[in-house]
Amino acid sequence: MLHCKMDEDFKIINMGKEIDLLAKYPKPNRDVIERLKHKSKEDVEIARKFGKDFFDGDRKNGYGGFSYNPKYWKPVVDDYKKYWNLNSKSSLLDVGCAKGFMLYDLSKLVPEMKLRGIDISDYAISNVVPEMKKFVQTGDAKEMPFEDNCFDVVIAINTIHNLEREDCAKALREISRVSKKYSFVVVDAYRNEVEKKKMYAWNLTGKTIMSVEEWKIFFKENNYEG
């Protein structure tokens, strides 16, 4: 399953079955014009290190403070449970799990479910929700440390577009490899030049940003079906 996210209004367009699994995620309030005025090459370089400055530093370098709040993922994981019929015997991998907030809320909703998370950021993994520490690890989406067909569901939200195009393709293949059946991938995309300009103005970490149609072609070229 592939979703393309139009950054300015958080609209999700599904390329396969019509389903929006992020419908309950709060819509962001972003001052794109202000970011465009002050965004610098240095800001981008700092953000792409995915360290403390990106998560918990100045807003110009990333989140400007990345802490747990149940309003974000708690409503969303309920839809995950219903859509994939998740239960205590299910398994799920979050690729780009950051501090494990989504995994934490899911663990509360579906106790004893097998949960795993990987993230390229040592800082994020070191500062993960305490309850999730034993379930997450530093890892690369291009070469995941898991066996084939290891998880019932693999999720990658706003993750693979942070890679160069070739590496993005590798990550897609890895997602397909470790997934038994289901995967859910969300990427930034634009529909027109206005959205494209806004997306490039706001985005700090994205290296592969394409239009909706270009993403469709890319996923088809890489045999990704979700």
Specify the residue positions occupied by each region the protein language model found.
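Class I (Rossmann-like) S-adenosyl-L-methionine-dependent methyltransferase catalytic domain
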Residues: C4-W84, S91-P145, L163-K170, E174, ...
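Conserved acidic residues
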Residues: D152, K181
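A conserved beta-strand element that flanks and buttresses the S-adenosyl-L-methionine
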Residues: I155
